[in-house]
C-alpha cells in the first residue's frame, strides 16, 4: 500500500500529454476507474466543415490540436510502463514498475503505437519516438495506410502530417516513414495517399511538397513512386465564386507552374523515374497552359511571372515532344489557352501570346509573330491568324466581341495588335460598303413607313378597301413594305437572342440596339393584328413603332467615329443617370400625388359650369371640366411643376390650404430644384468620365457589326473576303513546310531596335532584288492587296528557314564599329548588295 501511495504522490503532476489516474492499492487493476474530473474551462468543439451548405468556416489542412482527445485512440504502452486498459470513454492509467519487477527477468512488452502518438512524433520531427514503429507494424501485421492510422474525417496520413510540419524546410521523419512503408510492402500506396474529405480531396504529399517549395522533398517523393498525375480536385482547389480557395489545375505540374517554380517544373517533366505528361488535363479539361492563364490577374508582377513560365513550358514541351501542339489543345469548353485569355479578360497574357516571337531556330515554329524586315524603329511584322480570325470556331475576335459585359478589359483587348489592325482591315475592305448600303436601305424603309402612316385612311374602321387609284396602290405598297420590315426585325431579334443568350445585365448593356429594334417590330406586328381585328387602336401601336424606328437610326452612327462616340454617351447616360433619376422621380411623383388626391374633395369649385366655353376662359379661374380627385389628373398637374409649368392654384377644392401649399412647395423643391439639377450634374460627370471609355465602346460596337456582317456571308464568300495571306514561315519540327495564314502589320517602335530581332528579309522593302512600289504605306496594315504583288516572299522565307536549320548561330543583325580592312570576298558581297541601287 505504501508503494502504491508513493507512486501516486510521484504522479500527482503528470506530463502535459499524459493522463494519470492512480487507483487505490486494494482495487482490482482491471476494474473500471471512476470518471475523470471535468476540465474547469470548457473547450469549444470544433466542427470540420467541407460541404457548400456548411458553415462559412472551412477546416484547416492541419492543426496542432487533435479532436476527440484520447477517448477515440487506442492505448499507448511504453516498455517501462505498465498500462491498465480502461473503457473507450475513460482515461488510461499509467504506473511505473518497481525496480524489483524489472530485475526479475520478466520480458518487457514492446511499445504500442496509435495514430495520435505517430502524428505527435512526426509533427515534432522526432525520429526516436518512431524507432520501434517498424517492429510494431511487422508483429501486428499492420501498415501505415490502415484506417486506424488515418484521420477519420480527412483521411490524412502520418506522411501528410509530416509534410505539413516542416522545420527549416525538412522533417527527418519523412525518410523514416518512407523506409518503414517500403519494408511493410506499402510504399506506393503510402506515398500516394491523399485527403478523402470533400474540401481537400485528392491532395497528396507531392502536392504539399510543391506548395512548400521544397525541391528535395519533391525529388524524394518522386524517387519513391509518387504519382505525378495525382489530381487534387477538392472544393478548395476549384474555382468557385464567393468561396476561398486556390485553383491551379489540380495536377502537380500545374501547381509548380502556377506557383512560379521553374526548377520543379523541369524536374517533373525530365526526371527518369516518372516524367509528368505535359498535355495532361484536369477535371475541366485545362492543361498546364490553361491553368497559368487562369491564375493571371493582370497585375504587373503576376503577368510577368505567368508569361515567363508560359514561355518556358512551351519551349520545354517543344524540345521534349517536338510534334505536340500544346497550345492548340482545348478544354471542355472548346477554348485554347489563347481563347481562354480572351474570354477571361487576361489582357497581359493575351498580348504576350499574340505577339510572341522566339528567335531560337529549333523553337521558332512556336512564334506567332515573325519580323519580316526592320529599319531603325520601323518593323514590318507578320502575325499568325490561327485561332484569331472568324474562320475558326471560338476565334479570339468572336470570344472578345460576344463575351459578357462583365469581362474585364473587354474594350481594351481589341486594341492589342494584330486585333486592332485586323478589324480595321475588314472594315476598310468590305464591311464599310455593306454597312453604308444597309444604312441607305433603312433610311429608305423609314421614309416609306412614315409616308404610309401619314397618308393612312381616317374614315371608317379597318381594314380599309382598296380603291383603284394610284395613291391607294402606293399606300398599300408602302404598308406591305413596312410590315415586311417589321417581320424581318422580329425574326432577326429572335435569332440574336437564341444565338447569344445574353444575361439580364448584359441584355441592357450590350444588346441595347437589338432590344430597340425588337420592340419596334413588336409594335408593328401588334398594329397589324389590331388592324385586321377592326380596331382603330392600331394607330397607337403604329405610331410607337414609327417613333422607335427613327430613334433606332442612332444604330447606324457607329459607322462614323464622332457620331458613334456621341451615341455611346447618350446610351450610357440613359442606362446610368436617367434610369436612376426616373426611379427616384417616380417615387416622389407617386407619393405626392397620393397625398394631394387624398386632400382634394370633389365640389363645384373644382370644375367649370357646363355653359362656359373652355376656349374663352382665361386665368386661374378657368379649369377643365374633369375632377382632380383622381390619381391620373393629379400626376399630370404635378408633372407640370417638374418642368416649370405648374400652377399652385390649379384647384381650390380643399379644406387645408396651408397643407396643400406645403405639399406642392416640397414637391417643387425636391423635383424641379433638386433632382433636375442633380441629373444635369451627373450627366456632366458621366461625359467627362467615359470620354475615353466611349471611344473604346464604340470600337467594340463596330467590331460586333463587322463580325455580324461577316457571319451573314456564305462560307465561300468568307474565304474570299478573308484577311491575310497563306505564307511559309519556316519548317515544322518534323521537317515539313510550315505554312501560316499571316497578316502584316507595320509598326514603329522607338524602344526595340533591329539589333536582336530575327529578321526574315535582309533588305527593308526589297525582296530578292525586286523593290516595292511607292504605294506602300505604313497605315495599310494588310497582307493581301497590292502590297503583296511586288515581291515573292515564300522562296525567301524558305531560304531563311533553311539557313536557320543548317546554322548554329541565330539570325541577328549586329551593328558593330568596324576598324579592320576588308577582305576580297567582303568586297564582292558589298558589290552585289550595291548593284541594285546603282541601276
Curated annotation (Swiss-Prot):
Principal localisation: membrane
Activity regulation as described: The channel is sensitized by ATP binding. Repeated stimulation with capsaicin gives rise to progressively smaller responses, due to desensitization. This desensitization is triggered by the influx of calcium ions and is inhibited by elevated ATP levels. Ca(2+) and CALM displace ATP from its binding site and trigger a conformation change that leads to a closed, desensitized channel. The double-knot toxin (DkTx) from the Chinese earth tiger tarantula activates the channel and traps it in an open conformation.
Segments dipping into the membrane without crossing: 631-652
UniProt effect for mutating residue 632 to A: 10-fold less potently activated by the Scolopendra mutilans RhTx toxin
Binding locations of resiniferatoxin: 512-513, 551, 558
Molecular functions (GO terms): ATP binding; calcium channel activity; calmodulin binding; excitatory extracellular ligand-gated monoatomic ion channel activity; extracellular ligand-gated monoatomic ion channel activity; identical protein binding; intracellularly gated calcium channel activity; metal ion binding
Gene ablation phenotype (knockout): Mice are viable and fertile, but lack behavorial and physiological responses to capsaicin and show impaired responses to noxious heat stimuli. Their dorsal root ganglion neurons do not display calcium channel activation in response to capsaicin or resiniferatoxin. Likewise, their dorsal root ganglion neurons do not display calcium channel activitation in response to low extracellular pH.
Residues annotated with Phosphoserine modification: 117, 503, 775, 801, 821
Motif window: Selectivity filter: 644-647
Region listing for AD, in residue ranges: 685-713
Subunit structure: Homotetramer. May also form a heteromeric channel with TRPV3. Interacts with CALM, PRKCM and CSK. Interacts with PRKCG and NTRK1, probably by forming a trimeric complex. Interacts with PIRT. Interacts with the Scolopendra mutilans RhTx toxin. Interacts with TMEM100. Interacts with PACS2.
Function: Non-selective calcium permeant cation channel involved in detection of noxious chemical and thermal stimuli. Seems to mediate proton influx and may be involved in intracellular acidosis in nociceptive neurons. Involved in mediation of inflammatory pain and hyperalgesia. Sensitized by a phosphatidylinositol second messenger system activated by receptor tyrosine kinases, which involves PKC isozymes and PCL. Activation by vanilloids, like capsaicin, and temperatures higher than 42 degrees Celsius.
Name used for this protein in its record: Transient receptor potential cation channel subfamily V member 1
Species of the source: Mus musculus
Upper taxonomic lineage: Eukaryota, Metazoa, Chordata, Craniata, Vertebrata
Amino acid at each position: 500500500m505504501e508503494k502504491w501511495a508513493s507512486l501516486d504522490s510521484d504522479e500527482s503532476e503528470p506530463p502535459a500529454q499524459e493522463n494519470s489516474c492512480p487507483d487505490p492499492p486494494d482495487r482490482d487493476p482491471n476494474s473500471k476507474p471512476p470518471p475523470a474530473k471535468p476540465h474547469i474551462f470548457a473547450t469549444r468543439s470544433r466542427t470540420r466543415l467541407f460541404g457548400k451548405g456548411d458553415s462559412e468556416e472551412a477546416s484547416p489542412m492541419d492543426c496542432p490540436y487533435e479532436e476527440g482527445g484520447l477517448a477515440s485512440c487506442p492505448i499507448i504502452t511504453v516498455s517501462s510502463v505498465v498500462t491498465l486498459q480502461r473503457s473507450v470513454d475513460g482515461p488510461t492509467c499509467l504506473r511505473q514498475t518497481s525496480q524489483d519487477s524489472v530485475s526479475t527477468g520478466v520480458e518487457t512488452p514492446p511499445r504500442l503505437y496509435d495514430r495520435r502518438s505517430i502524428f505527435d512524433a512526426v509533427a515534432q520531427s522526432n525520429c526516436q519516438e518512431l524507432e520501434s514503429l517498424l517492429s510494431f507494424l511487422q508483429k501486428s501485421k499492420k501498415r501505415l495506410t490502415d484506417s486506424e492510422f488515418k484521420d477519420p474525417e480527412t483521411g490524412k496520413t502520418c506522411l501528410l502530417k509530416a509534410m505539413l510540419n516542416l522545420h527549416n524546410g525538412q522533417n527527418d521523419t519523412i525518410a523514416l516513414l518512407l523506409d518503414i512503408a517500403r519494408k511493410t510492402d506499402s510504399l506506393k500506396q503510402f506515398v500516394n495517399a491523399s485527403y478523402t474529405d470533400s474540401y481537400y480531396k485528392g491532395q497528396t504529399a507531392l502536392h504539399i511538397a510543391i506548395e512548400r517549395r521544397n525541391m528535395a522533398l519533391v525529388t524524394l517523393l518522386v524517387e519513391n513512386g509518387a504519382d505525378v498525375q495525382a489530381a487534387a480536385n477538392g472544393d478548395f482547389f476549384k474555382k468557385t465564386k464567393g468561396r476561398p480557395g486556390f485553383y491551379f489545375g489540380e495536377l502537380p505540374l500545374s501547381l509548380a507552374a502556377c506557383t512560379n517554380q521553374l526548377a520543379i517544373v523541369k524536374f517533373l517533366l525530365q526526371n527518369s523515374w516518372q516524367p509528368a505528361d505535359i498535355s495532361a488535363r484536369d477535371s475541366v479539361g485545362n492543361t498546364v497552359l490553361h491553368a497559368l492563364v487562369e491564375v493571371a490577374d493582370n497585375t504587373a508582377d503576376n503577368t510577368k511571372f505567368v508569361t515567363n513560365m508560359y514561355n518556358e513550358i512551351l519551349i520545354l514541351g517543344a524540345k521534349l515532344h517536338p510534334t505536340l501542339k500544346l497550345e492548340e489543345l482545348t478544354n471542355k469548353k472548346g477554348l485554347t489557352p489563347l481563347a481562354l485569355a480572351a474570354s477571361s479578360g487576361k489582357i497581359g497574357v493575351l498580348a504576350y501570346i499574340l505577339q510572341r516571337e522566339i528567335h531560337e531556330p529549333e523553337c521558332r515554329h512556336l512564334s506567332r509573330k515573325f519580323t519580316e524586315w526592320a529599319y531603325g524603329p520601323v518593323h514590318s511584322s507578320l502575325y499568325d491568324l490561327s485561332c484569331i480570325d472568324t474562320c475558326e470556331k471560338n476565334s479570339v475576335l468572336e470570344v472578345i466581341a460576344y463575351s459578357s459585359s462583365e469581362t474585364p478589359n473587354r474594350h481594351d483587348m481589341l486594341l492589342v495588335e494584330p486585333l486592332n489592325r485586323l478589324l480595321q482591315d475588314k472594315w476598310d475592305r468590305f464591311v464599310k460598303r455593306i454597312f453604308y448600303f444597309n444604312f441607305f436601305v433603312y433610311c429608305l424603309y423609314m421614309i416609306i413607313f412614315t409616308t404610309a402612316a401619314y397618308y393612312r385612311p381616317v374614315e371608317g374602321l379597318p381594314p380599309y378597301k382598296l380603291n383603284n387609284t394610284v395613291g391607294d396602290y402606293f399606300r398599300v405598297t408602302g404598308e406591305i413594305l413596312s410590315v415586311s420590315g417589321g417581320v424581318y426585325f422580329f425574326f432577326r431579334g429572335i435569332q440574336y437572342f437564341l444565338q447569344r443568350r445574353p444575361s439580364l445585365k448584359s441584355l441592357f448593356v450590350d444588346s441595347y440596339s437589338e432590344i430597340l429594334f425588337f420592340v419596334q417590330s413588336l409594335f408593328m406586328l401588334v398594329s397589324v393584328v389590331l388592324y385586321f381585328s377592326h380596331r382603330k387602336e392600331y394607330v397607337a401601336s403604329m405610331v410607337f413603332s414609327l417613333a422607335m424606328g427613327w430613334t433606332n437610326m442612332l444604330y447606324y452612327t457607329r459607322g462614323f467615329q464622332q457620331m458613334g462616340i456621341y451615341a455611346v454617351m447618350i446610351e450610357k447616360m440613359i442606362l446610368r443617370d436617367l434610369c436612376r433619376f426616373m426611379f427616384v422621380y417616380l417615387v416622389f411623383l407617386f407619393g405626392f400625388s397620393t397625398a394631394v388626391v387624398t386632400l382634394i374633395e370633389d365640389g363645384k369649385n373644382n370644375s367649370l359650369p357646363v355653359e362656359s366655353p373652355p376656349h374663352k376662359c382665361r386665368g386661374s379661374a378657368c379649369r377643365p371640366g374633369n375632377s382632380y380627385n383622381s390619381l391620373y389628373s393629379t400626376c399630370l398637374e404635378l408633372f407640370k411643376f417638374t418642368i416649370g409649368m405648374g400652377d399652385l392654384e390649379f384647384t381650390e377644392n380643399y379644406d387645408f390650404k396651408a397643407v396643400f401649399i406645403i405639399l406642392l412647395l416640397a414637391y417643387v423643391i425636391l423635383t424641379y430644384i433638386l433632382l433636375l439639377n442633380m441629373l444635369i450634374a451627373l450627366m456632366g460627370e458621366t461625359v467627362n468620365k467615359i470620354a475615353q471609355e466611349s471611344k473604346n465602346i464604340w470600337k467594340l460596337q463596330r467590331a460586333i457589326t463587322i463580325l455580324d456582317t461577316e457571319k451573314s456571308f456564305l462560307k465561300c464568300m468568307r474565304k474570299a473576303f478573308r484577311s491575310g495571306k497563306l505564307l511559309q514561315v519556316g519548317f515544322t519540327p518534323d521537317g515539313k513546310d510550315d505554312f501560316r495564314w499571316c497578316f502584316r502589320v507595320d509598326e514603329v517602335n522607338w524602344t526595340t531596335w533591329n539589333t536582336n530581332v530575327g529578321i526574315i528579309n535582309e533588305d527593308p522593302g526589297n525582296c530578292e532584288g525586286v523593290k516595292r512600289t511607292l504605294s506602300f504605306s505604313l497605315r495599310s496594315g494588310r497582307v493581301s492587296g497590292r502590297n503583296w504583288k511586288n515581291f515573292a516572299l515564300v522562296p525567301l522565307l524558305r531560304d531563311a528557314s533553311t539557313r536557320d536549320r543548317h546554322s548554329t548561330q541565330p539570325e541577328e543583325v549586329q551593328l558593330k564599329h568596324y576598324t579592320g580592312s576588308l577582305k576580297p570576298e567582303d568586297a564582292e558581297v558589298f558589290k552585289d548588295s550595291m548593284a541594285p541601287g546603282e541601276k
